[in-house]
Amino acid sequence: MPVFTHLNENNEVHMVDVTPKPDVSREATAKGRIYLRPETLAAIAEGRVLKGNVLATAQVAGTLAVKQTWALIPMCHPLPVGGVTIWFEQTDEYIEAFCRVKTYGKTGIEMEALTGVSLSLLTIWDMVKSAEKDEAGQYPVTRIDGISVIEKIKGTPE
């Protein structure tokens, strides 16, 4: 049976005490995709979106989200964010977002990477939603999926 560290011996939710753990370098990378209409993808690539530079805005939004993860996820520890790198790869069907986060601390930083990639993708959607809607106001093509942690690195204590 799996162990859920956020439940105490009375099966009550609590924030895990990480104070006895040593500080070590940590890194996590997450990715996810947003599927868009070909015309929208072309407009993004050619800088023709009226709201501005979609990918630059998504990078900023993702970075801000990384720094606020502790305030959004109840049992997530506030961590000193040492660095955030967000980048995108575009195909003729989707944009794939990547978010790498680094820290030096007592617990992993994968929730921050997942939050960063998620908000980057949501920001892309928000900036192009007017072009993605059909006549009925629905989004027949637009979807976000495949959000996952693709790498997690934990250093060793000194």
Curated annotation (Swiss-Prot):
| Entry's EC annotation | 4.6.1.17
Query: Coiled coil: which residue ranges?
Result: none
Kindly list the biological process annotations in GO that this record carries: Mo-molybdopterin cofactor biosynthetic process
The pathway is: Cofactor biosynthesis; molybdopterin biosynthesis
Substrates-to-products reaction catalysed: (8S)-3',8-cyclo-7,8-dihydroguanosine 5'-triphosphate = cyclic pyranopterin phosphate + diphosphate
What S-S linkages are listed for this chain?
A: none
List the active site.
126
Keyword terms, alphabetized: Lyase, Molybdenum cofactor biosynthesis
Which InterPro entries does the annotation name?
A: Mo_CF_biosynth-C_arc, MoaC, MoaC_sf, Mopterin_CF_biosynth-C_dom
Molecular-function GO terms, alphabetical: cyclic pyranopterin monophosphate synthase activity
Q: Does the keyword Lyase apply?
A: yes
Look up keyword Transmembrane and say if it applies. no
Tell me the CDD domains matching this sequence.
MoaC_A (cd01419)
Residues binding substrate, per UniProt: 75-77, 111-112
Assembly with partners or alone: Homohexamer; trimer of dimers.
Q: What does this protein do?
A: Catalyzes the conversion of (8S)-3',8-cyclo-7,8-dihydroguanosine 5'-triphosphate to cyclic pyranopterin monophosphate (cPMP).
**Family, per the entry?**
Belongs to the MoaC family.
- This one is known as Probable cyclic pyranopterin monophosphate synthase
Which organism is this protein's natural source?
Methanocorpusculum labreanum (strain ATCC 43576 / DSM 4855 / Z)
